[in-house]
């Protein structure tokens, strides 16, 4: 599939781009390559792709794991209180 220089100029105009003549030729070739690649993708059989696709996420077993120690977690906290991160108040009490 090819794209004409006029089509590239039209696309550039719609995109509010000003292209020089050598850029028109360059982008014409680039768009042609992209369209050829898209055509190749369209040729791929959908049945082969559907086998690899799953619309659900496999679940892992819910097993307890060791977590980080509170002291280590709060080492780099700018402010802490009662073993928790302290953050600035953003909601007025009234």
Curated annotation (Swiss-Prot):
Class of enzymatic activity (EC top level): ligase
Cited InterPro entries: Asp/Glu-ADT_sf_sub_c, GatC
EC numbers on record: 6.3.5.-
Superkingdom per UniProt: Bacteria
One GO BP: glutaminyl-tRNAGln biosynthesis via transamidation
UniProt xrefs under Pfam families: GatC
GO MF entry, a single one: asparaginyl-tRNA synthase (glutamine-hydrolyzing) activity
Reactions it catalyzes: L-glutamyl-tRNA(Gln) + L-glutamine + ATP + H2O = L-glutaminyl-tRNA(Gln) + L-glutamate + ADP + phosphate + H(+); L-aspartyl-tRNA(Asn) + L-glutamine + ATP + H2O = L-asparaginyl-tRNA(Asn) + L-glutamate + ADP + phosphate + 2 H(+)
Keywords carried by this UniProt record: ATP-binding, Ligase, Nucleotide-binding, Protein biosynthesis
Annotated PANTHER family: GLUTAMYL-TRNA(GLN) AMIDOTRANSFERASE SUBUNIT C, MITOCHONDRIAL (PTHR15004:SF0)
Subunit structure: Heterotrimer of A, B and C subunits.
Function: Allows the formation of correctly charged Asn-tRNA(Asn) or Gln-tRNA(Gln) through the transamidation of misacylated Asp-tRNA(Asn) or Glu-tRNA(Gln) in organisms which lack either or both of asparaginyl-tRNA or glutaminyl-tRNA synthetases. The reaction takes place in the presence of glutamine and ATP through an activated phospho-Asp-tRNA(Asn) or phospho-Glu-tRNA(Gln).
HAMAP family linked to this entry: GatC
Similarity annotation: Belongs to the GatC family.
Name under which the protein is recorded: Aspartyl/glutamyl-tRNA(Asn/Gln) amidotransferase subunit C
Source species of the chain: Hydrogenobaculum sp. (strain Y04AAS1)
């Amino acid at each position: 599939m090819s794209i004409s220089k006029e089509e590239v100029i039209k696309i550039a105009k719609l995109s509010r781009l000003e292209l020089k003549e050598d850029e028109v030729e360059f982008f014409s070739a680039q768009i042609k390559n992209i369209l050829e690649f898209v055509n190749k993708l369209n040729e791929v059989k959908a049945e082969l792709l559907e086998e690899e696709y799953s619309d659900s996420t496999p679940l892992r077993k819910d097993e307890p794991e060791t977590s980080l120690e509170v002291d280590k977690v709060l080492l780099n906290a700018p402010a802490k209180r009662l073993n928790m991160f302290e953050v600035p108040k953003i909601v007025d009490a009234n």
